[in-house]
Amino acid sequence: MTHQTHAYHMVNPSPWPLTGALSALLMTSGLAMWFHFNSTILLMIGLTTNTLTMYQWWRDVIRESTFQGHHTPTVQKGLRYGMILFIISEVLFFTGFFWAFYHSSLAPTPELGGCWPPTGIHPLNPLEVPLLNTSVLLASGVSITWAHHSLMEGNRYPMLQALFITIALGVYFTLLQASEYYEAPFTISDGIYGSTFFVATGFHGLHVIIGSTFLIVCFFRQLKFHFTSNHHFGFEAAAWYWHFVDVVWLFLYVSIYWWGS
């Protein structure tokens, strides 16, 4: 690195992409084992290896950016493009779920009773827990923006306060969603309605958990003075991701909970 004459970061060989791929294989295989054979051993191994991989990979990235100074403006620009492309890929991912929902609901087949929701399905009231969930996520969108502006202005404690509120709202949303699933009068196996409802809202819930984890990492980094007003892409990426999760929920609420009921 002493003879480097360019602004790019030549990453050292790392085992984490390999362990990450292995943990993803174990998790997906474990999920299938859990569904079909009611065994959670493989799933737990996958979750454990995935958690360890995330911790150590994040640790290495923090070392490279904060302590070794490898994240030059050029590198940060590349990371920004990468995050934008990742969010675009997530948009297309959710587009598939919305497509399945509208394909099924706009022209219900005779097997569904020719109506939507299908005969025998009692949908959730969109003005109860789903509306509260919407309020919680919109409030978290406001608080993450407050945290971002506080960081850009160099106000450390308001930033920590706003970030903590955002994390708390994210956890609250997850608990509300879990209670809604527990009390829902239909299951994932109740035809196309149950499938589209639980897959779309379930993947969104997974993204909320991922986003909350991302924000928790940012919270602890801010406690250790890792972010400055002009060098904080880790937090910025987390904020972008959180806003994406917010917008997806608004589409889910309007489509599946409100119009679909």
UniProtKB/Swiss-Prot annotation:
Its EC number is 7.1.1.9. It holds the Pfam family COX3. SUPFAM superfamilies: Cytochrome c oxidase subunit III-like. Residues 1-15, 67-72, 153-155, 224-232 are mitochondrial matrix. It is a multi-pass membrane protein. CDD domains: Cyt_c_Oxidase_III. Keywords: Membrane, Mitochondrion, Mitochondrion inner membrane, Translocase, Transmembrane, Transmembrane helix. GO terms for molecular function: cytochrome-c oxidase activity. It is found in: Mitochondrion inner membrane. InterPro entries: Cyt_c/ubiquinol_Oxase_su3 (IPR024791), Cyt_c_oxase_su3_dom (IPR033945), Cyt_c_oxidase-like_su3 (IPR000298), Cyt_c_oxidase_su3-like_sf (IPR035973), Cyt_c_oxidase_su3_a-hlx (IPR013833). Disulfide bonds: none annotated. Residues 35-40, 106-128, 184-190, 257-261 are mitochondrial intermembrane. PROSITE patterns: COX3. It catalyses: 4 Fe(II)-[cytochrome c] + O2 + 8 H(+)(in) = 4 Fe(III)-[cytochrome c] + 2 H2O + 4 H(+)(out). One of its GO terms (biological process) is respiratory chain complex IV assembly. The chain crosses the membrane at residues 16-34, 41-66, 73-105, 129-152, 156-183, 191-223, 233-256. GO terms for cellular component: mitochondrial inner membrane; respiratory chain complex IV. Component of the cytochrome c oxidase (complex IV, CIV), a multisubunit enzyme composed of 14 subunits. The complex is composed of a catalytic core of 3 subunits MT-CO1, MT-CO2 and MT-CO3, encoded in the mitochondrial DNA, and 11 supernumerary subunits COX4I, COX5A, COX5B, COX6A, COX6B, COX6C, COX7A, COX7B, COX7C, COX8 and NDUFA4, which are encoded in the nuclear genome. Component of the cytochrome c oxidase, the last enzyme in the mitochondrial electron transport chain which drives oxidative phosphorylation. The respiratory chain contains 3 multisubunit complexes succinate dehydrogenase (complex II, CII), ubiquinol-cytochrome c oxidoreductase (cytochrome b-c1 complex, complex III, CIII) and cytochrome c oxidase (complex IV, CIV), that cooperate to transfer electrons derived from NADH and succinate to molecular oxygen, creating an electrochemical gradient over the inner membrane that drives transmembrane transport and the ATP synthase. Belongs to the cytochrome c oxidase subunit 3 family. This is Cytochrome c oxidase subunit 3. It comes from Raphicerus melanotis. The lineage of its organism: Eukaryota, Metazoa, Chordata, Craniata, Vertebrata.
